[in-house]
UniProtKB/Swiss-Prot annotation:
Entry GO CC: mismatch repair complex
PROSITE patterns registered for this protein in UniProt: DNA_MISMATCH_REPAIR_1
SMART domains found in the cross-reference section: DNA_mis_repair, MutL_C
Function: This protein is involved in the repair of mismatches in DNA. It is required for dam-dependent methyl-directed DNA mismatch repair. May act as a 'molecular matchmaker', a protein that promotes the formation of a stable complex between two or more DNA-binding proteins in an ATP-dependent manner without itself being part of a final effector complex.
Family to which the UniProt record says this protein belongs: Belongs to the DNA mismatch repair MutL/HexB family.
Single Gene Ontology MF annotation: ATP hydrolysis activity
Keywords assigned by UniProt, alphabetized: DNA damage, DNA repair
PANTHER family (alphabetical): DNA MISMATCH REPAIR PROTEIN MLH, PMS, MUTL, DNA MISMATCH REPAIR PROTEIN MLH1
Gene: mutL
Record protein name field: DNA mismatch repair protein MutL
Record-linked CDD domains: HATPase_MutL-MLH-PMS-like (cd16926), MutL_Trans (cd00782)
Amino acid sequence: MPIRRLPPETVNRIAAGEVVERPASAIKELVDNAIDAGATRIEVEAHGGGLTRILVADDGCGLSAEELPVALERHATSKLAPDAQGLWDLLAIHTMGFRGEALPSIGSVARLSISSRAKGSSDAWSILVEGGSVGDVAPAAFAGDHGARIEVRDLFYATPARLKFMKSERAEALAITEEIKRQAMANESVGFSLDIDGRRIIRLPPEHPGPQGRLARLSAVLGRDFQDNAIEIDQTRDGVRLTGFAGLPTYNRGNAAHQYLFVNGRPVRDRLLQGALRAAYADFLARDRHPTAALYISLDTSEVDVNVHPAKAEVRFRDPALVRGLIVGALRHALAGAGHRASTTTAASALDAIRAQSMVPPGAYSGYQPNAYQGGPSPAGFSAWQAGGWTRPSPQVLPGLSDVSARVEPGGYGVAEAVREAAFGEYDAPPNVAYPGGFSEDPAPVFDPVDFPLGAARAQVHETYIVAQTRDGVVIVDQHAAHERLVYERMKGEMAAGRVARQALLLPEVVELDPAEAERVVARAEELAALGLVIESFGPGAVLVRETPALLGKTDAAGLVRDIADDLAENGQALALKERLEEVCSTMACHGSVRAGRRLTGAEMNALLREMEATPHSGQCNHGRPTYVELKLADIERLFGRR
């Protein structure tokens, strides 16, 4: 079969198949061009799922009459220029586009028209393309001072086979909306609007550059809940900077669709970045739950290759281990700084459920008479408390609480101290200790335990849930989930300090590896020993395992070493061992925690609350479920119609 040269029209259609997969792809390319042109406002319209009509208008620098026909030639672009030696460097790309394929590719499969006025020019021009056939440049009317207006009609009319693979108009419209959302999150200083079939879907004004403007844009796109439950990320390592916002572990989703990743301002879908994000949350989420995040990576253009995918949706890093380590480390540091915070949506969901179950038919209480209750026999173990009808457990029901109550006046300063003594024993200050502010004859300032972040324990419900009162609401704690997290964090702390118990193998095991893999593993011998795995070199391509972590019990040492070798090759870190140890710690913490059904004293409940406040990640258990729910007083009052 002879080799033939393909005609330009066929070449363009082949390129269009790679670059323009669907209407959302065409819009992405046109929006990229607008951003590269310096636009501050971009308007997008779509009809018929983008197949009937697409319009992208911007206020960028525009194109002159001479540039319009050149822009429609393949591989003609304003975004690359030769250096002093006349070389065209594809590793120094600072723009969204650079190949010069978008306009000719779209023009080869659709009816394309471009109207534009160049900045500083009084004249506007237009050009038409139909099925790859380029018309002449002609004068045109243009409303703005400068910019471009690109209209695409009958997308893929020249390639009918492609239309058979399009999804429904609704699905294509959703893809277009998602694309504009990603572009808007990547460029907070640019205003965006999107109309689909004449209906306004998105309208976003420009925001000020910086963290606050970015958070405002993310809130507008992802919702106020994301803003209320996000923590800021800002860390730099070896010239790579990671910024953005990540959701609390308890603010999670059932899929990874709410993970937005950007590299040098470019929206990407990259497995390395998604894997790093997942690894950072591995301690906090169940396997079927996914974190939410909008992360922005900035690095020198020479350290990343964006020319590895036709649609520029994927990138390749020169040092992937550095990028992965930065993401995992920065996210874990930020999550630790979040302390005991839990998602605000947890309480909202609980309130919605309460409202749904508490709908009372009109007139249901028509026969109710205030103060009609005349009293009666009190439940066993309870005594009347004050005149308001409230009851509290008697000392026989909650042993140990009476010891605290006897030493503390109600609402007095010593409540916390008494609780602490009941839980941990009395404490005598050493002599000659200077207290801040000194002592005086004046009475000590009154401190109310409800001022603690998680409040003061008031009751235990069903011997499973702790009810605590805060200054402006109520906190309900799952005692098992909370204590499980506390035990787990304590075990992780011991592991991080290198206090991992080891078990010696009766017969040291030889593991054969590729020589390069064996060298990498042996180079990390000291790090692995701190995690309980003692190895040494056993000649080229072999490793001798002498001791393994006692936590793992009887384990497959050879399989563990091979997994570590794979981790070192791919990520530069021995993640397999850490993950296995943490998984075992999680299981041990679950079985060694306070179980549901155990009755706690008031001192024990308050001690648990105080430890939660001082422990990172205590807002969720090891499986990603919330450990507590906080109901604001205002929300409770709304339930009873007081607001």
